[in-house]
């Protein structure tokens, strides 16, 4: 996978000014009392580069003396890096923001997260906050039906559109073996009485294609290779806004959602800056930025971008986190056996 390391933060002149004195405030991991927060902050994320850059730039407008180092990759590689560093006895990350709560539950079980009860949590729905305050969701990304409007006679309102005889060989979805969102979806769908593994068997029997990621699934729908796709909502809305012949449907049975949680790594070198960064992401300003980037904000009172539903408008499908976490590898094995991936 593509890996990038971006270094953002203060301009060279500010860094020189910060280093000109003998105060310890200029050292990495420090927080200056008079000049505000300072030092370095290592931010590990699975966000796209452009989103991570926009977030850090906005944070630095409030805290220009904090130099934010960003490591960006897919969720699996980000977590792999954290675990490798932990094994070596020195986790470099201060703040982590990756795909889903199941991933954070695993880190929590390994005692890698530091609890932090941000004041901004008052405006975040309780369902998306860890009761122990080791992580909280930052946005809402629902998996929806992507529909090619040139091929479909009308927009469906149910997930049954994927399993109807008329849709034979016309559906596509990302693989839980590669996509964190798809793995979460499999865990949620198979723990619903109205779906279960029978739903995935019907998908298989109806000729549903499987590709690695959401982007590839949407591309097939955009190109007219498939009529329907199981895809995260924001990329469908973006494609529609750009003129692609696609639309998105939130099926009446409900939708699984991932929330790209954020959390602080235990024994961070710059706790105050880490807390400030988390506060910013969850704040009204940070959530408006998420909306501007095309995501449904998780904070109440902040409008979703055009074409997407707000969290209050969604019928959310969910399952117990402990079951999703403990069952993820079994879910992947079951999927692999069923689809022959």
Language-model regions, residue ranges each:
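C-terminal motif of bacterial Sec signal peptides marking the signal peptidase cleavage site
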Residues: 15-18
């Amino acid at each position: 996978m593509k890996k990038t390391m971006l270094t953002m933060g203060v301009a060279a002149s500010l860094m020189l000014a910060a280093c000109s004195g003998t105060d310890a405030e200029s050292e990495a991991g420090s927080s200056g009392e008079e000049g505000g927060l300072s030092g370095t902050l290592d931010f590990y994320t699975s966000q796209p580069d452009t989103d991570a850059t926009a977030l850090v730039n906005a944070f630095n407008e409030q805290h220009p003396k904090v130099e934010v180092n960003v490591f960006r990759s897919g969720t699996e590689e980000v977590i792999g890096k954290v675990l490798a560093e932990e094994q070596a006895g020195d986790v470099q990350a201060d703040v982590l923001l990756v795909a889903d709560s199941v991933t954070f539950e695993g880190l929590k079980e390994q005692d890698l997260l530091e609890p932090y009860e941000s004041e901004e949590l008052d405006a975040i729905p309780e369902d998306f906050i860890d009761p122990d305050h080791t992580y909280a969701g930052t946005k809402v990304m629902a998996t929806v039906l992507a529909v090619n409007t040139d091929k479909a006679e009308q927009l469906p309102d149910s997930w049954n559109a994927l399993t109807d005889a008329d849709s034979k060989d016309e559906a596509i979805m990302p693989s839980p073996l590669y996509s964190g969102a798809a793995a979460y979806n499999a865990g949620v769908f198979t723990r619903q009485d109205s779906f279960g593994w029978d739903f995935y068997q019907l998908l298989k029997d109806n000729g549903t294609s499987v590709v690695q990621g959401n982007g590839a699934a949407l591309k097939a729908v955009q190109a007219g290779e498939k009529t329907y796709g199981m895809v995260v909502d924001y990329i469908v809305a973006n494609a529609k806004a750009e003129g692609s012949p696609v639309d998105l449907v939130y099926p009446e049975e409900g939708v699984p959602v991932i929330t790209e949680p954020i959390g602080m790594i235990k024994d961070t070198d710059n706790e105050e800056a880490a807390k400030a960064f988390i506060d910013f992401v969850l704040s009204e300003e940070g959530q408006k930025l998420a909306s501007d980037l095309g995501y449904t904000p998780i904070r109440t009172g902040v409008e979703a971008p055009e074409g997407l539903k707000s969290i209050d408008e969604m019928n959310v499908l969910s399952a117990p986190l402990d079951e999703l976490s403990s069952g993820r590898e079994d879910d992947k094995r079951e999927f692999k056996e069923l689809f022959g991936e």
